[in-house]
Amino acid sequence: MTLIARFVLIGALILVPSAGTAEQIFLTPRDFLAETFEGEIPKPRVLWIKGELKVAIADILGHKPVGLRIRYWGRGSKTAWILEEIGKYMPITAAFVVDRGQIRRVSVLVYRESIGWEIRYPFFTEQFLGVSLSADRRLSRTP
């Protein structure tokens, strides 16, 4: 193989994204909300991230929150949150249902990583069910 052919091949391998890093949509946000609220999706609400709340969120996440607000949906004591967080390298869109302060459902909606895809399966997500936030801003139990 000539030197030029080697450079072309190496360049192609580096620059062409692998099929494993393609965005995988497991559930659309709309479908998640429809399932959560039995077809009647409530109007979104907004939680503004400022002041003491911003500090608390940074303490919980271990980094400053991105953005100034978080949209969520709620009816009665049940709220649904669709959040995006960087996995190892790429964003992961996850959804959470919280009822009376406890996590009731966790779903991975969109996965963009090439590794760790197993987080979308129930054997992983179910470990968070029933978990709440303690007074010292930590999970009530370690999943």
What are these regions (language model features)?
Residues M1-F7:
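Positively charged n-region of N-terminal signal peptides that target proteins for export
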Residues F7-V16:
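Bacterial N-terminal signal peptides
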Residues T21-T142:
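Flexible, solvent-exposed loop/hinge segments and secondary-structure transition points
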